[in-house]
Amino acid sequence: MAFHSFLLEPITCHAWNKDATQIAFCPNSHDVHIYKKDGVKWTKIHELKEHNGQVTGIDWAPESNRIVTCGTDRNAYVWTLRNNVWKPTLVILRINRAARCVKWSPKENKFAVGSGSRLISICYFEQENDWWVCKHIKKPIRSTVLSLDWHPNNVLLAAGSSDFKSRIFSSYIKEVEERPAPTPWGSKMPFGELMFESSSSCGWVHSVCFSNSGDRMAWVSHDSTICIADATKKMRVTSLITDTLPLLCVTFITENSLVAAGHDCYPVLYTYDEAQGTLSFGGKLDVPKQSSQRGMTARERFQNLDKKASSDTNNITLDSLHKNSISQISVLSGGKAKCSKFCTTGLDGGMCIWDVKSLESALKDLKIK
């Protein structure tokens, strides 16, 4: 595991470029910083300044090398690299509340933005007018959309919101794509069609994620539960009440294994058994180091004041690499089918890259199916 602390400020969201040599993240501000790995060091090479409010979502398209950002200023920007300078293009989302999350579609011909306006903006480029336009998915969303994830077919879109529901919508836009083929989630997919809706849980849905095949969707909510809906099993929903603090993010690393993290400051493995229809705890993925007894330097004392609002040396040291809540997980290599590396960022301003093989060798009881 490689841990790097960029700043004292929390990292609210991040995205990687195609070859994982550059990372773009928001340090809890109006700006986006882009760092490049130079040997073992990270060097800031760009700073994207255009938003008037805090940046809440970032996604980096691997093939077109475009970055999309959204923020509390109710706008989205598509950034294009020209002559080593990132140029922004404003996208009017037609919303009256903050944008909360953004995701490029797999084919990168459209992107989705979730917002506090109780809707999802599906944005695509209109060649005739040379402009980004959007269509809205509204019903039956009743509260802020907190998370999004695309199905591999480029049409179905998973959304989690603070009305305690996770849903799957069709985002088919005939202007930019061909009619989609039937999927286990359904065959009729006009724009805005509700393909799946979970029953009410007891908490905001913080994160949603499709599996590599697209036949399963997982989500985590604020009542410390993790759930999977399996389209090949008649939309069967399997849930597990965890003994952790609420989870904030989740991703598939194989078709049957998931990694989730949140307020406990370390990632956790969960395993799905398709035959039995059960979810089980697979293990904690953070190997604690033996702490050494020593005094605190002045620098560490001020860092504790800034990160944890305390300078007390007693009972404040966490065994985990992250020292505050983990806000996002992203797959770095191998994809969701067979992930070999994944990344976590947190409110401690740190970024950690986890090697799956190293985790399996370090944790003897760990079994990733």
From Swiss-Prot:
- Which keywords label this protein? Actin-binding, Cytoplasm, Cytoskeleton, Nucleus, Repeat, WD repeat
The membrane-spanning stretches of this chain are none
Record flagged with keyword Cytoplasm: yes
- Highest taxon in the source lineage: Eukaryota
Q: In the UniProt record, which is one GO cellular component term?
A: cytoplasm
GO MF, any single term: actin filament binding
User: Would the keyword Zinc-finger be found if you checked this record's keyword annotation?
Assistant: no
Q: Where are the WD repeats?
A: 6-45, 50-89, 94-135, 140-179, 200-239, 242-280, 321-364
Tell me where it mainly resides.
cytoplasm
Q: Where in the cell is it found?
A: Cytoplasm, Cytoskeleton; Nucleus
General function of this protein: Component of the Arp2/3 complex, a multiprotein complex that mediates actin polymerization upon stimulation by nucleation-promoting factor (NPF). The Arp2/3 complex mediates the formation of branched actin networks in the cytoplasm, providing the force for cell motility. In addition to its role in the cytoplasmic cytoskeleton, the Arp2/3 complex also promotes actin polymerization in the nucleus, thereby regulating gene transcription and repair of damaged DNA.
PANTHER family from the entry? ACTIN-RELATED PROTEIN 2/3 COMPLEX SUBUNIT 1, ACTIN-RELATED PROTEIN 2_3 COMPLEX SUBUNIT 1B
- Assembly and partners? Component of the Arp2/3 complex composed of actr2/arp2, actr3/arp3, arpc1 (arpc1a or arpc1b), arpc2, arpc3, arpc4 and arpc5.
Q: Which family does it belong to?
A: Belongs to the WD repeat ARPC1 family.
Protein name as it appears in the record: Actin-related protein 2/3 complex subunit 1B-B
What is the organism field in this record? Answer: Xenopus laevis
